[in-house]
Every structure is written in structure tokens, then in C-alpha cells.
Amino acid sequence: VGTTVHYPRNTCAPMECGVVIAEHLPGDEGYDVLSNFMGPFSLHAVMAMALKVAGNKLRHRVPRDSGGSFGVKQAVFPYVVMMCLASRKAGAPVKWVEDRLEHLSAATSATARLTHIEAAVTPEGRILALRYDQADEVGAYLRAPEPATFYRMHGALTGPYAIDNLSVRNRVVVTNKTPTGLVRGFGGPQVYYALERLMDRVAVALAIDPVELRLRNFVPSDAFPYTAAAGAVLDSGDYTRLAMMAIAEADVHQLRERQAAARAAGKLYGIGVAAIVEPSVS
């Protein structure tokens, strides 16, 4: 059973746009920067190399509070480098404040992905293998830390399911759009949108309830710690019990009644289910 899905670009609009204040320190041949860049340590080495200085020659400070980010402000780092160079040229501190139009026009967006995904399935609904063919549209060029959208989730491509066999093909496509980057759990939505759509397709093909299909494929509670096919270590859990708690809390019977009434009135009313596992660290 297979399906092809397209996950579109999407982004966030934090209340506070990007801000950088940079000062060249001529005696030190270093730089002092204050910005609302999200996670300055993560790309500190990249910025230092771009400026052709040792890491200890670039001091990068961030305020304790920032008006939102959701990953988008990771893309402030190119402007940090540019403002450092502008400060060196001007011989004075330089401040850059991104306005809303700039942000909406050119800020980072989540990576668009085209995925073809297939499952080898027994007649009883046990999934034996998965095959992913993923193509990420990353804009005009790869900008650090891309293609991390692929690899943050790579170890967990089988989700919460006990699937022993996995084949993966990843490709990057460049276009004439702005570069992509980190947005809200980057890599996770792209993977699970495809995987959970496939689970629903399998359920339809075998005439099995979507919840029951997932229950048949969850990693058993006595199998933890469980090493997934692509390497993720799932340390603990009871996915079946958790799913049953969610079903009970959702009152599916009442949802079905609402669905029937809505459809009788000519309205669309869907009931969705998804099971995901997110890495605890990036």
C-alpha cells in the first residue's frame, strides 16, 4: 500500500522581528553582538568562520526575553555576519531592525516536502516494512543547519510502530524561493503527515479501524527500551494504554453521532487519529 503526499511551506510571524546590534572591536580584531537570534551557540562556529575570526573573537549575547521565535529567528545569523562587517566598515556600532514587511517577504519558512511512502503489510494489518522517497524543496540554496529537516527525524521514521525493515531515499531540490530553516518541530510534521496518511490508507485497504490498525503495530510495552530500524532509541512507554486513554477521553461514540448529524446536514465532519514520537533533543 502506498501514497504520495505534499507537505507545503509554512512559517510563523513572531511578535518581535529580528534585531542585531553589532560592534567591531579593532584592538581585538573581534566582534561584540547583541541580537535576538534563537540559540546563538548553535551556529556560533558558522558565524565565526564567515567572519574569518577565531570563535573566542565573536561574543554573541541574547536578551533573556524575546518576542517569539518558533525556530524562525535561527535565520537571523546571516544578518549578524553582515552587521559585523558593516560595523567594521563604518568604524562604529551598527543596528539593524527587521520590519514586518521584510519578515513576511524573506523570513525562513518550513521546508516543503514531497513524499512517496509505501508499506509492506500482512492481511492482518501488521506492517513489515516501510519505503520512503522524500524530496525537500529548500529554496535558492542550502542555509545552515539545513538539510537538518531530514535528519532531525531520521532515527524515528518508523514512528511509534514496531517496523523492522526500512528503506529511505532523501533528495534536496533548490528553487527560486527564499531558503528554508527551522519552524516548530522542524522535520516532525513532514514525516508524520506522510506516515499517518499511509496508516489511514492501509486501514481503508484492509477494512480495519484506523485506531485498531495502530494498536496492532505499536511497539509493545514489554519491548522497551526499543531501538527503531533507523536507530532511534525509544526508552519507555505504553503506547497501547495511552491510545486507549485518549479514545476514552475523546468519547468517540459521541463524535460519531456528531459526524452523522453533520453529514446529514450536508456538512463535512472528519475524525482523525495520529500517533507520533518526537525526539527529546535536536
Task: Outline where the language-model segments fall.
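Structural alpha/beta core scaffold segments of enzyme domains
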Residues: V1-S282
